[in-house]
Amino acid sequence: FWVQTNPGTRPGPMMKVASGGELSRFLLALKVVLSDRGSAPTLVFDEIDTGVGGAVADAIGARLARLAGKVQVMAVTHAPQVAARADQHLLISKAALDKGKRVATRVEPLANEHRREEIARMLAGAEITKEARAAAEQLLKAAG
């Protein structure tokens, strides 16, 4: 695809011209259009929010939530704005085993308090503050 991302610039190949955020939004738009045509009952988005800020991540989360009304949506995200809008939240983690010779992946469903704590961790990092918990609670309330 050739795109023109800003007025006054020349069109060019999307992979060279578009930013990470622009590529993410294009992929989301493309999958939305394809889902309207009944192309797949499940859509998987792997870090669709890469390279975007909080407001755009919130808009992506809202669009994914609307899309989930039509098809099953699975999204891997590091954005708390996206995670807060999910119907189900799974925490995926990896751990080294056998002194680093093997890796095990764990998938843990989160509910209520654990979900709020994970969203707070996504916001604050390793040290979760009361402000991060309050912000996580606000994101969950806003998401409905």
Explain the meaning of each model-derived region.
Residues V32-D36, G54, R66:
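Conserved helix-loop functional segments at active or binding sites
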Residues D46-E47:
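Walker B catalytic acidic pair
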Residues F1, T5-P7, G21-L43:
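GG-anchored amphipathic helix commonly corresponding to the ABC/SMC/Rad50 NBD signature/C-loop
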Residues F1, V17, L27, R116-G125:
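Internal helix-turn-beta structural module
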Residues A55-G144:
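C-terminal lobe/lid and adjacent interdomain/linker elements of RecA-like ASCE P-loop ATPase modules
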Residues G12, R37-G38, T50-D58:
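Conserved D-loop-proximal element of ABC-family nucleotide-binding domains
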Residues P11-V17:
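Short pre-catalytic strand/loop immediately N-terminal to key active-site residues, enriched for Gly-Thr
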Residues P7-P11, E22, K101, E113:
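Short flexible coil/turn linkers enriched for glycine and charged/polar residues
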